[in-house]
Amino acid sequence: MRQGTINNYIKLSKNFGGVRKCYEGKPSIAVGGFMCDPALMPTYPNAMAAGTLVYADESARTIVPIYTFKVKSVDTNKKTVTVEKFETGTIAKVGMKLIVVGNDLSDAATNVATVSAIDSSAEDVDVLSVDAVTGISEDAVLAEAGSDNKIKAVPNGLTYCDNAIDPDAYAIDIDYIWNCMEKPVLERRMPPLTASLKKALRDNECYFRFSNRK
């Protein structure tokens, strides 16, 4: 840490749990780095928050972030969806396809919202203009969808810290965690999860003790 900044509030951290400190303990990090396509990263200077869901391919040594969004409000007339934003910044991008996370991640969504514009002027929320708001309601959890209208990937881990990519970088490697049982994972300090997403983590041999306290 730079001298004289111990009492500062920062926008991202490479320490365990990121700037929001979503891990009380020191989780188990998977061995080795996993390469992430820079196009999948938030636009600089925004960052991917600690606790972001990921799918890591052990064979290919690649990693795909799975972005989730907590809906704060929906304007059906303007076709806008207001979503929670962390200190790490905006993670949505124009062209991103979003679906409501259902009870079964293997099901394709009937309704898909494609982001056409983003108002990121507020500190704590982003307002997403979309082509349709059908099926989206307050407090719903949205996730980025793939071409098959299912969640982009089934998660098998969480990021251990905040991650940002420099505008001059041509590649980035990201480490992920799969185990944090000794102390709780504070889910209210991380991107939103659903029961189905937690089940997917368990099914993929991830071991987390989630806590709903702040």
Model-derived features: positions:
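Surface-exposed, low-hydrophobicity beta-strand/loop segments enriched in small/polar/acidic residues
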Residues: M1-K214
